[in-house]
Amino acid sequence: RQKLWRWENFPEDNQPMTADLPASLSMYPEYTFVGMELYFSPEGIPTIQVDHPMTRDPDMGLLKPVDFKNSGWMPRVLRWWDDVNHIVAGRLTVTNAMTWWRGCLDLAMQLRSYDKLMVDVYERPQFVHDLLTYLTEQRCRWWGAYSEYFGLKLKPTDIGDDWLNVPFISPGFFRDFVLPRYLEIETFHAGIASIHSCGDQTPLQ
């Protein structure tokens, strides 16, 4: 019904109507994987935690390793996957739509806040490198566990990094802090299929 409604109301949407059922609870599960709270209003508007302990204190010890089965919403995600498959009973292909899409910069901005992360670049650049490296490593570990759990092969990945645009960051910041992490993701997945941001990426290319 959702796909038919989308087709009827958004004719310019060129996404194919496939005979499968995505098992999804919402967008933004990655924030919960790294310890942030995520809430939705009755209208479906998300609110992401802005007062994580790391927002106040640039201490890497405040972050715990991500556990594929137990971190954040993952227990709910996996229960939902099992429940949907039980209901469908093989009549449709069920796809897991709750994946780690967000990039390292997006998560770092949410953990520290934009203003504080930009100050960190000048006052404690090694901390910024460590934070982005940690988030990238956790993302890759999560995808490795995801592929093993669902019996899938790793493939080129998509990345959503809303702050990956000028003037919020400079080409120099991207080159020195973010690009090395993207290259690690590219190596791990054997490619990057697409990168989404909410602004102008052209000066970064």
Annotate each predicted stretch with a short phrase:
Residues 1-46, 93-94, 183, 190:
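N-terminal basic, low-complexity leaders that serve as flexible interaction/assembly modules and, when applicable
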Residues 1, 21-22, 45, 64-205:
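Active-site loop segments of alpha/beta catalytic cores
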Residues 25, 46-57:
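Active-site beta->alpha loop and helix N-cap motifs at the rims of alpha/beta catalytic domains
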